[in-house]
């Protein structure tokens, strides 16, 4: 199995990418990795070249670049070349912690959209209080969506949850303003009616306040709603940890309490740590394309590689394609 990785994407590239790649190589004996980027910079952190290949390029896509224009004009950019490796059949999948918009453009224009899928979806795995997490899609690939798009998201998310996350008969929920069937806007009502008859375990509407309680294994929504929900959850978690730290450091007594509570607090932190869940998959493409978090450290990159490897090994893309071919709504 071969995975191409944009070594220059992300806040801590290429160090985090190289270290994460070496960690993955040690863990998985069947894995080969191509690091795409500036060879001189990559070699500063590369201590072993076992099953690791460097594809040199001086060009990269910057966060300030307009995504579509950058992908079309910067043909030799590390992200574009990683995607090209997939298109050419040299790699089975690709990963980047670079610009989300650029990676979506590279996925569409270079890797290509899966036949029958109208709109790809960006799907991270979000943490829950029980540590199991849930798949959420879409969180920003498409801010405007039609009922058929959300229907397809539900099917793709269900396949992923079962194949990669090992959840038997995963529960699929529709993010809405209430749990009753008649709630929401016209889009939500139409999607609800469609999902009731879908070949998935649809559990109905779910509210954003219940997401972290693990009410569903797959949560479906349009990209605008999903992005707002995602950033609200991230912001709330950061604020709570910040307030907790401030209070625990406010006096000598509270500092003593913090020392006693530290092991439990670390368990809580690990449960809510995005780095353990891998990256956000771009569903609806011809091959796995994974968006790692922009601030990924080496553990985050390792988790994204582990996730990508599972997608390839469990044949997620062929399974989604097969399921979609059988669907009467295409």
From Swiss-Prot:
Where it sits in the cell: the answer is: Cytoplasm
Signal peptide (residue range): none
A GO molecular function assigned to this protein is: phosphate:acyl-[acyl carrier protein] acyltransferase activity
Q: What does this protein do?
A: Catalyzes the reversible formation of acyl-phosphate (acyl-PO(4)) from acyl-[acyl-carrier-protein] (acyl-ACP). This enzyme utilizes acyl-ACP as fatty acyl donor, but not acyl-CoA.
Record's protein name: Phosphate acyltransferase
Q: In which pathway does it act?
A: Lipid metabolism; phospholipid metabolism
This protein's GO cellular component annotations are: cytoplasm
Q: What class of enzyme is it?
A: transferase
- InterPro entries assigned to the protein according to its UniProt record, in alphabetical order: FA_synthesis (IPR003664), Phospholipid_synth_PlsX-like (IPR012281)
Q: Tell me the protein family, please.
A: Belongs to the PlsX family.
Q: Which reaction does it catalyse?
A: a fatty acyl-[ACP] + phosphate = an acyl phosphate + holo-[ACP]
Highest taxon above the source species = Bacteria
Identify the main location: cytoplasm
Instruction: Return the EC number.
Output: 2.3.1.274
Q: How does it assemble?
A: Homodimer. Probably interacts with PlsY.
Q: Which PANTHER family match?
A: FATTY ACID/PHOSPHOLIPID SYNTHESIS PROTEIN PLSX (PTHR30100), PHOSPHATE ACYLTRANSFERASE (PTHR30100:SF1)
Would you kindly state one Gene Ontology biological process term found in this protein's UniProt entry? fatty acid biosynthetic process
Say yes or no: keyword Lipid metabolism present: yes
Q: Which organism is it from?
A: Bacillus anthracis
Organism lineage reads as: Bacteria, Bacillati, Bacillota, Bacilli, Bacillales
**Keyword line:** Cytoplasm, Lipid biosynthesis, Lipid metabolism, Phospholipid biosynthesis, Phospholipid metabolism, Transferase
The primary gene name is plsX
- One matching Pfam family: FA_synthesis
